[in-house]
Structure formats: C-alpha cells, structure tokens
A protein has these predicted regions:
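Short terminal alpha-helical segments
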Residues: 2-24
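Residue-level detector of well-ordered alpha-helical segments, enriched
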Residues: 8, 34-41, 56, 85
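Noncatalytic partner-interaction/assembly domains of nucleic-acid and motor enzyme complexes
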Residues: 21-31, 71-77
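Long, charge-enriched amphipathic alpha-helical scaffolds and associated charged IDRs
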Residues: 22-23, 32, 36-37, 52-53
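Structural motif
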Residues: 28-38, 80-81
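Short, hydrophobic/amphipathic alpha-helical patches that form generic packing surfaces
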Residues: 39-49
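Short, surface-exposed beta-strand/strand-loop-strand elements in extracellular ectodomains
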Residues: 52-63
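Helix-rich interaction surfaces within compact, conserved domain-sized segments
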Residues: 67-105
C-alpha cells in the first residue's frame, strides 16, 4: 500500500521531534528518498492532519503528485507538527511507527 518503508517514516518522525538539532540530518535524509516515497510521505502526513481520511490514501497520493512544487524538506519543515501528523497518519492507515522508532534509537 505505502510507497515508503515504515522505518523511513519513523526516522523522519524522530528527526522531526528534534528539528531544532536535527534539521540538517532531516534534510539530508529526505534528499535520499525517491519521488514516490516523497509523495507517499506527504499523503501520510495529510491523512494524519485530517486533510484526507485513511480510505482516501490514493486520492491523497495523487494530490501529492499533482501539487509537488515545493521541495519535500521545505514543505515538511514548514508544516507545524509534521512529525505528529506522520505518526497519526500511520496509525490511521493501520500501521504503527512505535516499534520502528524504538529500533532506531
């Protein structure tokens, strides 16, 4: 279903929770993602902030593809609470980032 591994989303969430100290690392990590992973990441975040429902994942994904004009790092960092939205989005999609986050610590 998702075009990005949960472990990658978990890593982004961890960086997001420490954005003041980890912005450079977050930007570097996001640069390693391919286009499909970036679109999926944005769709997950939108679901987590209630812009789309979990049932509308593919619609959110298509919207992310159409509206991708800002670099993913800039868009995420410019979105307040993006890490919380990513966690919520994964939960709504039936996946938890908690185990993946713990394995990365």
């Amino acid at each position: 279903m998702l075009d990005i591994a949960v472990t990658k989303v978990a890593q982004i969430i961890l960086y997001g929770h420490e954005i003041d100290r980890a912005e450079a690392e977050l930007r570097g990590f996001l640069e390693t993602l391919n286009e499909d992973e970036c679109h999926s990441l944005i769709a997950i975040m939108w679901i987590g902030r209630d812009s789309f429902s979990a049932d509308e994942y593919y619609e959110a994904l298509e919207t992310a593809k159409r509206e991708a004009v800002t670099p993913t790092a800039d868009y995420l960092i410019g979105t307040p609470h993006f890490a919380d939205h990513l966690e919520a989005g994964l939960e709504l999609l039936g996946t938890s980032a908690s185990d993946a986050e713990q394995s990365l610590l």
